Amino acid sequence: MSSNVEEFRQILSSSEKIIVLSGAGLSVASGIPTFRGSGGLWRKYDSASLATPSAFAENQARVWQFFHYRREQVLNVAPNAAHYILAPLTIPRIRQSISPNSKFTHITQNVDGLCTRALEETMKDYHETDVPYPIEMHGRLFDVVCTAHDCDFRETNYNSPICPALKGTELVFGAGGPEPMVRRSDLPRCPKCGQLCRPGVVWFGERPHRIYEIMRLADEADLCIIVGTSAVVQPASKIGGRVKARGGKVALFNVELGNHADEADFVFLGPCEQSLTEVLGI
């Protein structure tokens, strides 16, 4: 395990297939708390217990209030330096200066969309139009999906609030007040069939988007850069190990070592926006 910047840059420059796996730590500097820990708690319910199909089946209003709160958080923040350091790596002519002839894929567990926003802004700055977007394996916070099995409605919705009944419930949370009562009939409905909608994120117990493609990329990669994740949630937690098992290198950028630090060839501890800037220097 090394923290030698020049050694890592040499590995980066010679790599041919690079993947980045990013997690909640990437967005901390934007003001979004991590999914776990004291910043990830919601009243007496922690976020993991609310982000499940069973939680939604039991209390749709509570789950929608939680995700409305998260939506309102993200609507008021912007990408940070860590997002803007990773974004240019997606653009081939920029990446060539630090890793010639390489292919690059950004896989994110985040649902806040900040990776994509940073990339779109970077594309405009460099006048690029045909660049692969990050793979958002856990979906997107601003997507809304119909719960009816025979309805294919899905849309991206940035309305604030997403429905009148949820307006102000995020303020009650912030003040530590009692849980507001919201009727199920007043929650977001499908405009096509009228049935209840759900947030368009992947909940615990559901299959991540494009997971087979992600595992294929991990099997082919010769460098995996893990940024801002404790590597707890499966199957994302397996990605670094798969790269390592096939002879690839793993670099970890995080504020702590995490569960799979023993798989890392390089470890750069500290806030992502600082360590990525210092090491990559883009």
Positions of predicted regions on the chain:
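Conserved catalytic core of sirtuin-type NAD+-dependent deacylases
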Residues: 1-282
